[in-house]
């Protein structure tokens, strides 16, 4: 891609890196003025990632593998770092992995944020992160064959269903709080929802000592499906379906990744329309979570009222794109349909109505003593991890739309509720500005050139955090590799730290404050580390206890 070197970001960081590690960088390739991929010597991979992460304000949203044996004879691992210091940019650190040994040095001992990504690379490609502290499977089930790795190019057809290798659960749950505690899992996971998960809460009396959990029970294989059965244009509509709540955010992230790879300039009006729909999506997501927050503290009147107002955001989506869910609008290079004058006026009317409704509901919410009493001081997250890609790396039209960055110092459940309240009002203001200031440009860029094996990142600040996609184009209008990372993928690993030191009745509030992308955790295993006894109970029972705080499920 032709990038004007005078406007390239990250050059000072790369110069410092090359000085710190002479000869470490083997290759350097620009995707955009704000994205660069460097190939480094594999033995220096942990040193380079650690240096960028700690010395240059790096953040590690995503890492992934790729089977590039048909391109260069190797596998590859990519660590995508968001540089958030004075010079904001993306630096992707790549290392080639020998196809025979399949070994590469684990980054996790240096940068713990890499643990889930390296476990997934091990599952999906059979690569071996030497020194990885947690050797458990992440994505693949217990009964999956040891020598079958789904994302290898020669491994399997996505339709293959291998015979199970075991008929029992073998996943070892870990209790870091008390290594002597005996864990006795009771009963199988009973799947009653689309997205189940299995939690283990290790408790001493009512206090949570540690927590562990197993997810990925309904892994859909979307990346394999995209690479084998779809053209890169068709994947746009698959990306819409990654999540039932923030599907449009994934669609923007995916199209943005391909547009960055091919150097496509998206018309400004399309950028504005994308931003409008992203804020509509943020509205209905935040209002949903505010309603659930009311429910978790026993304030079901607030739950019903927030869901009543949320209906107006769904009406807004239907008005703008013809569907109550924000599906099917994006194309690579722009959007499929315009926002006409009558739609704009009706949307502005809904914005005014929602602002009045939400103001009244928030006043009622904050006047409910149980809300602050139950949510302050629990589920604390370190304030240093707070970030918002709309500000750090503006995309779509976020560089032009006025917006406010909201932070609360508590880092607890109450702070997360209040950030959603403030962002709801800000989304309404952003919608008004964008609808009143729509540029007069085309909606779609057409006639661009397809470049096999071009690649780039795309990203969006979804309601739950950042969605980050990476796309490498292949031959015949297909994708060679698509990495789709949802916001909750990065939120789950920190949950155990949020739960520690809190009580069992706090668990639903803490989990709900992340607004995780899963339908229901059907069962929770409670392990009493003092009595060395365990009990498996329905999650609804834990939720009930969190609301009324009577009849403990531990007894």
Model regions and ranges:
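Terminal low-complexity/charged segments
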Residues: 1-207, 367, 371, 427, ...
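Metal/cofactor-centered catalytic core regions of large enzymes
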Residues: 45, 112, 138-555
């Amino acid at each position: 891609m032709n990038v004007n070197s005078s406007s390239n970001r990250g050059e000072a960081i790369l110069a410092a890196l090359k000085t710190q590690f002479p000869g470490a960088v083997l290759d350097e390739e620009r995707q955009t003025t704000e994205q660069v991929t460097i190939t480094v010597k594999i033995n220096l991979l942990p040193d380079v990632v650690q240096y960028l992460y700690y010395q240059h304000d790096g953040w590690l949203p995503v890492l992934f593998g790729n089977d590039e044996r048909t391109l260069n004879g190797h596998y590859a691992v990519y660590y995508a770092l968001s540089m958030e210091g004075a010079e904001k940019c993306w630096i992707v650190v790549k290392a080639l992995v020998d196809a025979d040994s399949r070994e590469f040095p684990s980054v996790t001992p240096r940068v713990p944020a890499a643990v889930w990504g390296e476990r997934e690379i091990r599952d999906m490609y059979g690569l071996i992160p030497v020194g990885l502290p947690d050797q458990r499977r992440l994505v693949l089930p217990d009964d999956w064959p040891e020598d079958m790795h789904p994302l290898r190019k020669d491994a399997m057809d996505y339709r293959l269903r291998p015979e199970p290798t075991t008929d029992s659960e073998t996943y070892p749950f870990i209790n870091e709080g008390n290594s002597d505690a005996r864990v006795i899992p009771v009963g199988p996971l009973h799947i009653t929802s689309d997205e189940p998960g299995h939690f283990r809460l290790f408790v001493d009396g009512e206090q949570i000592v540690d927590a562990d959990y197993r997810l990925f029970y309904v892994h859909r294989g979307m990346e394999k499906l995209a690479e084998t059965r779809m053209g890169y244009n068709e994947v746009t509509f698959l990306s819409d379906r990654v999540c039932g709540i923030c599907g449009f955010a994934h669609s923007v992230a995916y199209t943005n990744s391909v547009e960055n790879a091919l150097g496509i300039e998206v018309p400004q009006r399309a950028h504005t329309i994308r931003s409008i729909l992203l804020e509509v999506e943020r509205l209905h997501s935040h209002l949903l979570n505010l309603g659930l927050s009311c429910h978790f503290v026993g304030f079901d009147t607030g739950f019903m009222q927030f869901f009543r107002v949320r209906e107006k955001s769904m009406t807004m989506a239907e008005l703008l794109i013809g569907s109550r869910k924000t599906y099917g609008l994006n194309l690579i290079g722009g959007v499929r349909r315009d926002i006409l004058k009558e739609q704009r006026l009706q949307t502005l009317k809904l914005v005014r109505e929602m602002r009045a409704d939400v103001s009244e509901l928030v006043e009622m919410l904050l006047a409910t003593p149980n809300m602050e009493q139950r949510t302050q001081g629990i589920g604390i997250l370190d304030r240093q991890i707070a970030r918002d890609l709309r500000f750090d790396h503006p995309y779509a039209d976020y560089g032009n739309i006025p917006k406010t960055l909201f932070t609360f110092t508590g880092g607890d459940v109450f702070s997360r509720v209040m950030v959603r309240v403030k962002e709801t009002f800000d989304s309404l203001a952003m919608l008004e500005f964008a609808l009143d200031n729509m540029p007069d440009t085309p909606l779609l860029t057409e006639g661009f050139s397809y470049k096999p094996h071009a690649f780039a990142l795309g990203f969006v600040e979804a309601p739950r955090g950042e969605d980050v996609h990476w796309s490498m184009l292949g031959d015949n209008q297909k994708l060679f590799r698509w990495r789709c990372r949802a916001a909750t993928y990065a939120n789950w690993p920190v949950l155990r730290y949020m739960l520690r030191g809190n009580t069992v009745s706090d668990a639903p509030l803490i989990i709900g404050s992340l607004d995780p992308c899963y339908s229901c955790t059907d069962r929770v295993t409670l392990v009493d580390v003092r009595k060395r006894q365990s009990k498996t109970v329905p999650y609804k029972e834990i939720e009930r206890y969190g609301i009324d705080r009577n009849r403990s499920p531990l007894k």
